[in-house]
């Protein structure tokens, strides 16, 4: 009888652990999906066919996920307060918040401002020429041009890993689970 009670207790702990794990994982996925929606909103502000609208949403989401620690801003309170999802530093008279290390982290009114600034940086800064030239080859090729973005020599590998393991599966399952429906008038064609 004691063994059965012990098994029931362990089963209960296992189920509780599984529920907790799934809840945490779903929370991270929800943050990512919410940010992806905002990226798409910002990209829709640009003319169709423009360079800004061609930058893959998954590319932008991957950079933001890496720079924010999967949108949790753990240990990056200043970046969180500044709505800075890309670690962009202020120049000239741009609004900023000082970090504990003395850097001037650019401050944005909202996450859309941060996304616009990142798109503009990648589009206009000569250092990201290789990234822009790879735009038609997809995010993983674009990452190769981002080695100048961070001091970490493994930055492009980190981007590729986060893309393959976190961002790409969201896009794949979203398209799989929620197929686009044709209007009723076109369904019988």
Please report, for each region that a protein language model flagged, where it lies by residue:
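Membrane-penetrating hydrophobic segments
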Residues: 2-13
């Amino acid at each position: 009888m004691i063994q059965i009670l012990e098994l029931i207790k362990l089963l209960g702990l296992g189920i509780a652990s599984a529920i907790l794990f799934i809840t945490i994982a779903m929370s991270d996925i929800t943050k990512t999906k919410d940010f992806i929606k905002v990226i798409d909103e910002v990209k829709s502000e640009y003319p169709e066919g423009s360079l800004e609208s061609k930058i893959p949403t998954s590319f932008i989401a991957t950079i933001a996920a890496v720079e924010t620690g999967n949108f949790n801003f753990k240990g990056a309170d200043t970046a969180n307060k500044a709505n800075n999802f890309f670690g962009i530093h202020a120049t000239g008279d741009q609004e900023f918040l000082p970090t504990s290390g003395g850097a001037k982290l650019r401050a944005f009114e909202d996450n859309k401002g941060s996304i616009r600034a990142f798109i503009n940086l990648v589009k206009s800064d000569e250092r990201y020429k290789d990234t822009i030239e790879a735009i038609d080859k997809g995010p993983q090729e674009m990452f190769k041009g981002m080695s100048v973005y961070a001091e970490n020599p493994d930055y492009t590998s980190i981007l590729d890993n986060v893309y393959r393991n976190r961002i790409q599966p969201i896009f794949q399952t979203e398209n799989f689970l929620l197929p686009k429906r044709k209007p009723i008038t076109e369904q019988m064609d």
